[in-house]
């Protein structure tokens, strides 16, 4: 009986329209936090803003924004950064020479410390709902940016790194179905096949338990499976992966490369996976991304 239920659930999830799951309307958006400070993370002082946008249907959208103090043009390009799970305002220190560009670091709607303070089992449905809200939150954040006096609305892009790279395909797929307003983007250290990625990264349980856990989570999160969205992205992308990556299997990132339509630029580094303990690699990835985005005239020098 359990096997039949599991099989039926798997078939149902795999036949659901992922867009119907992810295309959530935010409803009314109201700023509830907008604080500003002037600080120097690296070589120059910039204006930093912390914003929270209350929505009716997709929870609170939170982001940190870095703006130049001296603006050489009335409007500027915008990079929306989707980073790792521990992303926050401190990540601005990796973005050297940001130039006359606005950098927006998106904060995920589920904080990792909530895992430590709550029962894992009880949090699964909450995490699932939050993950499904991410693409709609990112596009709603983009809509809010469009309304800001400082944004060049023709040059707003999304750049995803590690954990964040897995949301980029769904974000651009949704954008493509709407008004196709996003500029060319970056997918760094991403891959496809959530099941295989979990099998690679879950270390502790026995093999049967690992397989069961990976199947359950991959099925529950199937609407955000990158392989569903990659062929539907109608844009240009920089794709970066590492040959020494022990978290993203080679077949996973090779399939990602295959599924992304042209035009695309693929860079393969002789590096492992990015991590907060490897700031040099993070800086390298940011600089590669900036160079490509400047060549494509997505951002200012």
Role assignments for model-derived ranges:
Residues 235, 249-258:
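Short alpha-helix in the alpha/beta-hydrolase fold that links the catalytic acid
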Residues 27-72:
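N-terminal cap/lid segment of alpha/beta-hydrolase-fold proteins
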